[in-house]
Amino acid sequence: MVKVLDEHERTMAFAEVALGQIRSLRQTAVPRNYEIWYIYATGYNAPLNKIINETLARNGNLTEADLEQIYETYLSHI
């Protein structure tokens, strides 16, 4: 039971980061954006995190076109 609770808390933390990013960047709360930010929060996809960090550093935000390109490049094949 403890392991299940730990997994619940760990995954809820990822979910909170994902929703926090969507809120702070004023993005639409659609499944694609949630998936992008959830994977970002886990740190399991280093290339995705790198391109997001670079784009945010360069532009200060992610456009819908950026999000679509990120999804198509780094997540649509999963």
For the regions a protein language model found, what residue spans apply to each?
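Extended alpha-helical signaling linkers and dimerization cores
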Residues: 1-78
